[in-house]
A protein has these predicted regions:
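Core motif of extracellular immunoglobulin-like domains
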Residues: 30, 41-42, 94-97
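Type I single-pass or GPI-anchored cell-surface glycoprotein architecture
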Residues: 1-6, 115-139
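Short, structured motif recognition centered on aromatic/hydrophobic residues
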Residues: 41, 65, 77-83
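Extracellular/luminal immunoglobulin-like beta-sandwich modules
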Residues: 87-89, 93-119
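N-terminal edge beta-strand
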Residues: 2-28
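N-terminal V-set
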Residues: 33-66
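Non-cytosolic beta-sheet module surface loops
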Residues: 30-34, 85
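Solvent-exposed loop/turn motifs of extracellular immunoglobulin-like beta-sandwich domains
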Residues: 20-27, 74-78, 86-96
Length: 139
């Protein structure tokens, strides 16, 4: 089974990437294939030391990290992940995971890139989304 060997590159291709500036908050929605009682939010992998949240509750918070779980349908649920006051060290790969005794684990990955530049809500203007026009620079 080739796709098992290429699993890492497969995950890579499907990983959503979010870019934010230092100081901003972010909420990312993880889509999971079944409902599960144990919810985990991890950095990189869900190994000891990488687990940010490990809970059986539908809503939980640990410091700057919080999750909100919603069971949608028999084979579908969502986990909203919020990280507040982002820092450069928050950049990286994250994993949402649902665990159930008699089911395989369900997981979703996302990547955050935190760019430099203090976020200031008062004068925040995202110039990156404005089209470049020469007429802006009239003499």
């Amino acid at each position: 089974h080739k796709y098992l060997q290429d699993r890492d590159s497969l995950v890579d291709a499907e990983t959503n990437i979010y870019t934010k500036r230092e100081g901003e908050d972010i909420t990312v929605r993880c889509y999971l294939t079944f409902s599960g009682s144990r919810k985990l939010l991890c950095k990189e992998t869900c190994e000891e030391g990488n687990i940010l949240i490990d809970t059986y509750r539908d809503e939980d918070q640990r410091g700057r990290y919080s999750i909100k779980y919603e069971h949608r349908y028999i084979r579908s649920s969502i986990l909203d992940v919020t990280i507040t006051k982002l820092t450069k060290s928050d950049s990286g790969l994250y994993r949402c995971e649902l665990q159930k005794d008699w089911c395989p684990d369900s997981e979703d990955n996302f990547k955050i890139i935190v760019t430099e530049g203090e976020f200031n809500p008062q004068n925040h203007e995202d110039i990156s989304i404005q089209p470049f026009r020469k007429s802006t620079f009239k003499e």
